[in-house]
Amino acid sequence: VNTPALPNAQITLVLSNRKAAYGLTRAAQSIPPIPTAYLALKTYLQQHPGATREDYDTEIAKIVLREQPDIVVLAGWMHILGDGFLELVDGRKRVEDNDELSVTEPIPVINLHPALPNQFDGAGAIGRAYEAFQKGEITHSGVMIHRVVKDVDKGEPVIVRQVDFVKGESIEEYETRLHLVEHEIIVQATSRVLNEVKPL
């Protein structure tokens, strides 16, 4: 067990599309170390002339499926995963020429997004929310863990938590408070979805 916050779970792989992602460092320094993998879209496309973004998503799915996970948790993943990924992990499509990588039960995929449902979807959510607060348009934002679907940040929320803005607070201070909430609810949401897949 390498996840004290989730005693009945084990992280089988930390995969990143950013070489400098801190998650890769933390995984490598874990005792025992957690396996890691890195694959950036740009690198993949350079190494595979003629390949497409969907081919990349398929390759990411293959990396994930080799680990036979019960859940995929996206936290800090900075690439929008399309149907090339989603159809393979939810079983709508099979991996060509490799039955071992094909799933019989859908693997849930959840994502951490630093905003409330239907507010500030996509990248830069914290900055856009803070700017709206500065303009007096909102008094709070929040964090959600949602199921991943084709449309960005539109999947069904698993957990939503409101985080109020504080007058005079810098964006860095707000972001620090927001991250504390993220760390708490990512564990709760992972546990909740795992219990749906593999009840104790």
PLM segments and residue spans:
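One-carbon transfer enzymes
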Residues: V1-L200
